[in-house]
Amino acid sequence: MSKHSSDLNNLISHIALYDSESAYKQFFKYLFPVLYRFSYCLLKSKELSEEVASDVMITLWKNRKNLPELENVKVYALVIARNLSLNVLNKHSRHELVSIDDIEIEVALDSLNPEQLLINGELKKRLEQATQSLPDKCKMVFKLIKEDGLSYKETASLLNISVKTVDAHLVTALKKLALVLHMEVNLLWLCI
């Protein structure tokens, strides 16, 4: 078991046993962004995604006594988020939900000169654009595995698809992102 899993399990235990609000706040800081990003992949709306993520966190707090019994609380929370998001989509099926979201990607900025910062900023922007241009399933699989750290099996279970389909979506996403980034890097070097 990783230290991260152990820390998460300790937080869950404190929430369940002691109704610890401080442990819940740490748990919230960890899980809310994951739930938000996942919901956003389905809903394409900042407001609705925040609402779904908040509803999941409230549900987890209300059911806190049962959390230690769950095998994987993160996957459980994502399943709730999926179901709530699908309910929202069903309610809004006649309306197209569109919003622009800024997915933050951490870039190591230590000892970079202004030119490198500019190049990294451009690459980050292009990567975000390339990620947004992926087909919905590819984008969702990419984010769940690469950004949220879920396994192929957990992702397959969450999306109700096979592990091989998860692998195929991830390969497609990585190929498209690599192609876009390769072209962008070549273009940036031509400009320098």
Predicted regions and their residues:
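Structural recognition of an alpha-helix C-terminal capping motif at a helix-to-coil junction
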Residues: 51-58, 71-83
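Amphipathic, Lys/Arg- and hydrophobic-enriched alpha-helical face
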Residues: 28-46, 63, 131
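Arg/Lys-rich amphipathic alpha helix in sigma70-family domain 2
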Residues: 65, 79-98
